[in-house]
Amino acid sequence: MLLADPEWLHADAASLWKIIATGILKSGPFDLVLCGRQASDTDGGQVLHWIALYLGIPVVTPVTRIETVDNSNEDGTLTVHRLTEEGTQRVRVKLPAMLGVSSEMNEPRLPPMRGLMNAGRAMIPAWKKADLGVR
């Protein structure tokens, strides 16, 4: 989904988390929400925590690696690695969950030509303020 409205351009963290959380709920059931660990302009790192609190799901940040996904029973879990001051910590988290990913998470790669062509035709829902009903 794409959440885009000119009124949101200069929104503060308290407004942004409500907008994003509303969009997540509107999009339907989910198991995992991935987001950056912090905004590049404010370096705040608080929006993802507010979203997770509102959604009632655990949050782990900054994640450098997703090790395993276990959906063998009703309560699925993820095992992830997160950065700490002492190094790296291995954490198991119950799904649904939110992960704040670190720049160390992945080395970007180029998709095959077919993937690029399919991406160009993909329909991504774009929602504005009126679509979400947020103030």
Where are these regions (language model features)?
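N-terminal glycine-rich FAD/FM-binding segment characteristic of electron-transfer flavoproteins
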Residues: 1-135
